[in-house]
């Protein structure tokens, strides 16, 4: 497990250092503020992709074990990690790589997860004012950019063979989260599989759609406007 933690920690270093110029948004471009960037597409039309070298190294910062992707505000980088069984939300200064703050989620039993996964896999969503984080072991937490907790919403831990991976999404005033249980897992309640939409300002549930026959899923929703 120690080797596994070190491997995930190192992968963060590479992402932050050598992928940094790709993720820096140009003025007026769509922000890289969610899983896979603008609307989850994985595409930045104005990005210039080159082969990184040691000369491109700006800074490096050791980080805890985890698999979430970094998301960017104007001057900060946000991601999650796990340290000493604590679920962490982490903010770094974009220019220097300095860790600005770490916030622990409320103490909870850590969900079961596959050795190649982690309980800190979902990627946060950040907008101009707030940061939204989902941990399968706990639920949703909203912070401001300075790390002040705005609200939290405990949710039942999804049951699956591999752990949780679905990331939160913001659309207008809604925070959307997919929560899927595996109907074929022992003690699993298939009726708990659902999509939630919460008021992003308060964490109050606005609507939910049940998926009673859906097995485990790890996808993150995207918005289709038509």
Where are these regions (language model features)?
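Noncatalytic, solvent-exposed loop/strand surfaces
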Residues: 26-226
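Intrinsically disordered, low-complexity segments enriched in Ser/Pro/Gly/Ala and basic residues
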Residues: 8-10, 20, 28, 201
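Bacterial N-terminal signal peptides that target proteins for export
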Residues: 2-15
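Bacterial N-terminal signal peptides
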Residues: 13-23
């Amino acid at each position: 497990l120690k080797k596994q933690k070190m491997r995930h920690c190192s992968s963060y270093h590479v992402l932050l250092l050598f992928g940094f110029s790709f993720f820096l948004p140009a003025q007026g471009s769509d922000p890289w503020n969610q899983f896979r960037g603008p609307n989850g597409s994985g595409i930045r039309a104005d990005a210039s992709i080159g082969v990184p070298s040691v000369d491109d190294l700006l800074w490096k910062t050791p980080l805890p074990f985890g698999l979430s992707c970094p998301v960017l505000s104007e001057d900060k980088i946000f991601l999650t990690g796990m340290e000493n069984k604590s679920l962490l939300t982490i903010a770094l200064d974009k220019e220097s790589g300095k860790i600005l703050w770490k916030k622990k989620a409320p103490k909870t039993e850590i969900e079961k997860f596959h050795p190649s996964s982690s309980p800190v896999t979902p990627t946060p969503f950040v907008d101009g004012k707030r940061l939204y984080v989902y941990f399968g072991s706990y639920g949703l937490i909203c912070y401001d950019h300075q790390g002040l907790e705005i609200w939290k919403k405990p949710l039942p831990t999804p049951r699956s063979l591999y752990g949780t991976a679905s990331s939160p999404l913001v659309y207008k005033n809604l925070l959307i989260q997919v929560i899927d249980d595996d109907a074929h897992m022992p003690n699993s309640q298939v009726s708990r599989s659902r999509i939630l939409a919460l008021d992003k300002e308060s964490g109050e549930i606005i609507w939910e759609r049940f998926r009673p026959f859906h097995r485990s899923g790890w996808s993150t929703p995207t918005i289709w406007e038509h």
